[in-house]
């Protein structure tokens, strides 16, 4: 396991390095005017622009710029925002919004895991019964209906009949977070329920379950001590990635409820050509995805040490 973990860690770091390099090179292919604010473009002469670019090191050879870029990354220095918040460190610009998305994402993921897994267990336990039909109908509905429609239904029901605020507000964080968290949870609950039901139903057809019944084990013991444990093994691989992706923010949900989180930040940065913010966000999202996959692989091996996730050398 240690050998595989180290190997996957090295692969993840190399992937992050390559993505960061690719993003850096793509940013350098853009016109240099995007490195100035709109006010600077109007006021600066060509000589002043050249001097500013030289001072920022943007006229240095690409290899030299790359070395400086990697050094800055190691020190968590991502530069300053030039258009969204002129002069503010990118870390500060992203940090405030990341905190909001992280809080909503973690709460939504926790709710989704508990409700979704429990729903999947009950569907598997009462397969082809009324509860299973209801759960399946919910899963189909959530996946078939566009997110904007389901968000609108939640908004109307939650605001009209339950009195929750329709827009996110920093003055009333708790109440105004209910509808966004609900919308984030809807699809995740359906996903976890579907996975849990599927894997548990598959396990219920295994020979060892028939043997357990012959030995006289109760349905509850079979379901929770054997079926659920084995069914959760393939699921845990996706849980870290799901959490990290959710924490990264939801563009549609955050736009819909005016949540000042991570979701709209990338599109705003692209539209306003704030290159340092764009560069940092792309790298951040890549890191979240890669770390999620890495943690999922390792977690699956921790849950069931019998599993060998492997290359050819480990299969021998």
Report residues per predicted region.
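N-terminal Sec/SRP start-transfer signal
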Residues: 1-13
């Amino acid at each position: 396991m240690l050998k595989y973990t180290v190997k996957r860690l090295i692969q993840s770091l190399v992937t992050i390095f390559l993505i960061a390099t690719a993003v850096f090179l793509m940013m350098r292919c853009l016109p240099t005017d995007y490195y100035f604010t709109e006010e600077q473009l109007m006021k600066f002469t060509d000589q002043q622009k050249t001097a500013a670019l030289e001072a920022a090191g943007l006229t240095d050879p690409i290899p030299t710029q790359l070395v400086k870029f990697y050094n800055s990354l190691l020190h968590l220095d991502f530069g300053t925002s030039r258009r969204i918040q002129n002069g503010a460190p990118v870390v500060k610009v992203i940090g405030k919004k990341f905190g909001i998305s992280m809080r909503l994402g973690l709460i939504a993921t926790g709710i989704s895991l508990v409700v979704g897994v429990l729903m999947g267990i009950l569907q598997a336990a009462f397969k082809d019964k009324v509860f299973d039909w209801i759960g399946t109908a919910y899963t189909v509905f959530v996946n078939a209906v566009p997110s904007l429609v389901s968000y609108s239904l939640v908004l109307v029901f939650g605001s009209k009949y339950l009195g929750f605020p329709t827009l996110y507000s920093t003055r009333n964080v708790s109440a105004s977070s209910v509808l966004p968290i609900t919308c984030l949870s809807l699809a995740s609950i359906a996903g976890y329920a579907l996975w849990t039901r599927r894997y548990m139903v598959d396990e219920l057809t295994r020979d060892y379950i028939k043997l357990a019944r012959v030995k006289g084990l109760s349905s509850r013991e079979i379901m929770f001590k054997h079926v659920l444990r084995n069914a959760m093994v393939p699921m845990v691989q996706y849980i870290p990635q799901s959490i990290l992706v959710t924490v990264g923010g939801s563009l549609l949900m955050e736009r819909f409820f005016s949540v000042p989180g991570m979701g709209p930040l990338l599109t705003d940065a692209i539209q306003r050509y704030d290159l340092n913010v764009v560069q940092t966000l792309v790298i951040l999202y890549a890191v979240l995805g890669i770390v999620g996959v890495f943690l999922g692989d390792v977690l699956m091996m921790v849950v069931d040490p019998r599993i060998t996730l492997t290359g050819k050398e480990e299969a021998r």
